[in-house]
């Protein structure tokens, strides 16, 4: 209670010792656990799993009239119980390791990411992470031998990298009156695309799946610029919706597509699609909230909610008769903290977008060499080229774990390139 206004305040803190002495002297203090308002659930399981808000909200909304034991509480939370055969890790390991890995095939990504999606949705990803590391280790060999060549590979049958997406669309749709949309979901990993694909299937829509490679480092400034430039990105580019729109309009202007039939939308609604023949659309709703997710189950829940909002815009284009190409500028990966950069290390980097959780862009190659001289243990863990270095494995330059991007893990480098045509 505040004497000046008569208002009453309730403060929630992790520890009563955090309360200032003068406030504590006047306040009514009590210890409270979230389990106190979730009657009927096993308290031990609630404390054991420490579920996120989305799960707690689900439990609260499904109030019980009877008590659930530990196994029933886990099931209600969406956590897998120990005796469920679907999560026999030995069997899963055998199945995953038997997948023939073709890193240019959507079939490979679907098979691998179906296991990942199932694990994430049931909070089993930590138990499966060793398998993801194994697969990624094989992917790194592919990157070393093939990545640079993919950037200049012919786009006629399909784009192998994001800089070839627009050239492919242009070659596949030579008629200016063809209605074509590029639908970019910022930061969408392939397992998240499978969630979208399942939602489309409920509407009897079956995309033609392919994969495409993000630009490296897998950051928005470079990879999405390459998408909308239809060419290799420029370091001097300033990433914002205005410049992205400019790239989109300029690309089609050079191909003699009338400007009046071209449109670009950033995070808005699809409006009057029947007026245009080239529609560029970007939604950043996934990426904007991705970095705040404490684990992949949080990201799974976020994705479920965001895709419900995204799907109607896809349907507007579909109903307007567009051929829709759905892709992403990069994916994401759950990364483990290495450490934060110190002041000297930060001073060696470009100031704008040169250091993220998973990439470093140095002002000079000498600075890069010095960094690895001081941190020799990182040489094998990072892909180094020119003046940049990116994490190969699931680590980040942070003080705590986070979901992020910028490196060359297969979950952030391989993005969907899906085509939808109206039947």
What do these predicted ranges mean?
Residues 1-180, 187-324, 328-423:
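…; additionally, a secondary subgroup of soluble metalloenzymes is captured
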């Amino acid at each position: 209670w505040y004497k000046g206004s008569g208002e009453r305040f309730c403060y929630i803190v992790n520890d009563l010792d955090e309360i200032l002495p003068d406030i504590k002297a006047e306040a009514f203090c009590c210890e409270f656990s979230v389990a106190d308002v979730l009657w009927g659930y096993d308290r031990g399981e609630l404390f054991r799993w420490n579920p996120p808000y989305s799960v707690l909200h689900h439990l609260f909304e499904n109030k019980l009239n009877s008590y659930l034991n530990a196994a029933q509480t886990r099931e209600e939370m969406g956590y897998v119980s120990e005796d469920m055969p679907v999560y026999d890790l030995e069997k899963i390991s055998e199945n995953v390791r038997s997948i023939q890995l073709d890193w240019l095939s959507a079939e490979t990504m679907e098979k691998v990411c179906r296991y990942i999606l199932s694990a994430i949705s049931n909070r089993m990803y930590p138990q499966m992470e060793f398998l993801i590391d194994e697969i990624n280790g094989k992917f790194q060999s592919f990157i070393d031998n093939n990545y640079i060549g993919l950037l200049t590979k012919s786009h006629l049958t399909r784009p192998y990298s994001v800089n070839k997406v627009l050239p492919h669309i242009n070659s596949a749709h030579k008629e200016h009156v063809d209605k074509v949309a590029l639908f970019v979901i910022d930061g969408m990993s392939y397992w998240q695309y499978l969630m979208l694909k399942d939602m489309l299937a409920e509407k009897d829509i079956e995309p033609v799946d392919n994969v495409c490679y993000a630009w490296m480092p897998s950051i928005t400034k470079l990879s999405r610029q390459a998408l909308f430039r239809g060419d290799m990105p420029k370091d001097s580019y300033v990433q914002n919706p205005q410049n992205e729109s400019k790239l989109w309009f300029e690309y089609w202007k050079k191909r003699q597509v009338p400007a009046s039939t071209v449109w670009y939308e950033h995070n808005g609604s699809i409006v009057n699609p029947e007026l245009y023949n080239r529609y560029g659309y970007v939604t950043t709703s996934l990426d904007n909230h991705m970095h705040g997710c404490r684990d992949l189950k949080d990201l799974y829940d976020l994705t479920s909610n965001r895709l419900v909002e995204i799907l109607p815009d896809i349907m507007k284009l579909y109903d307007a008769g567009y051929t829709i190409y759905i892709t992403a500028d990069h994916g994401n990966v759950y990364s483990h903290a290495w450490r934060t950069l110190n002041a000297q290390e930060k001073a060696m980097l470009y100031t704008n977008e040169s250091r993220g959780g998973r990439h470093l862009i140095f002002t000079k190659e000498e600075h890069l060499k010095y960094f690895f001289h001081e941190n020799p243990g990182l040489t094998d863990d990072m892909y180094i080229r020119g003046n940049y270095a990116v994490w190969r494995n699931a680590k980040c330059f942070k003080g705590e774990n986070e979901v992020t991007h910028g490196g060359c893990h297969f979950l952030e480098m391989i993005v969907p390139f899906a085509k939808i045509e109206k039947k």
